[in-house]
């Protein structure tokens, strides 16, 4: 039996991004635990519009912070974003594409699978 965390489809969670290195644990995956109060579980392929919306919402992921090893994000980067903020972005028509197979199952506490599938770019 696999000890990997699960995605929203009930399958093993796939890697989101290792360049830039993402995830609550900075392991490249949108893994989570009880200490992840931001619920960094949505594997997004960020867009400029989404990043600008996030910055206006108080979560600046554009500005580099080398002291934390954070390069700043740009259009097309993969990143584990906060499920609650992503839900707000969707409600504001600012949601960006996501990799649903790389999005953690805990995301379903904040967004229904039907909404997530509308933004998924990795479903056949």
What are these regions (language model features)?
Residues 104-124:
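Glycine- and charge-enriched low-complexity intrinsically disordered segments
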Residues 1-49, 113, 120-122:
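Extended boundary segments
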Residues 62-69:
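Short alpha-helix capping/helix-loop boundary micro-motifs
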Residues 45-60:
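Short, basic/aromatic beta-hairpin or loop at an interaction surface
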């Amino acid at each position: 039996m696999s000890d990997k965390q699960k995605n929203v489809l009930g399958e093993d969670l796939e890697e989101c991004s290792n360049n830039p290195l993402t995830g609550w644990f900075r392991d490249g995956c949108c893994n989570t635990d009880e200490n992840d109060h931001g619920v960094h579980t949505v594997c997004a392929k960020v867009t400029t519009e989404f990043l600008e919306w996030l910055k206006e919402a108080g979560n600046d992921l554009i500005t580099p912070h080398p002291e934390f090893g954070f390069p700043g994000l740009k259009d097309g980067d993969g990143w584990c974003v906060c499920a609650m903020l992503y839900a707000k972005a969707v409600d504001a028509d600012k949601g960006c594409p996501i990799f649903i197979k790389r999005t953690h199952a805990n995301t379903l506490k904040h967004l229904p699978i039907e909404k997530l599938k509308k933004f998924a770019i990795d479903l056949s």
